[in-house]
Swiss-Prot record:
N protein regulates the transition from the early to the middle stage of lytic development. Disulfide bonds: none annotated. The keyword Oxidoreductase does not apply. This is Probable regulatory protein N. Keywords: Transcription, Transcription regulation, Transcription termination. Protein N is an immediate early function essential for all other phage vegetative functions. One of its GO terms (biological process) is DNA-templated transcription termination.
Amino acid sequence: MVTIVWKESKGTAKSRYKARRAELIAERRSNEALARKIALKLSGCVRADKAASLGSLRCKKAEEVERKQNRIYYSKPRSEMGVTCVGRQKIKLGSKPLI
């Protein structure tokens, strides 16, 4: 009697590519985290020092938003300024206002 042994599937090219990318990203993240830790130790900064040194960011005023001056034309017509267009009904011998 013959026994058939199936090999494990290596997966598709896309899954292998994604696995390689995941390994590279994980390695890069660990390297960046280690580099940040080393830089922090070398600089001797603590969170409190960083917060105190960023006083300019705390005192920074919020930017004012520019507002449109012609807003009254687009609001509900309370006066004649609110009417921005006039409609006309065209017929064979002339045009009549829609009012």
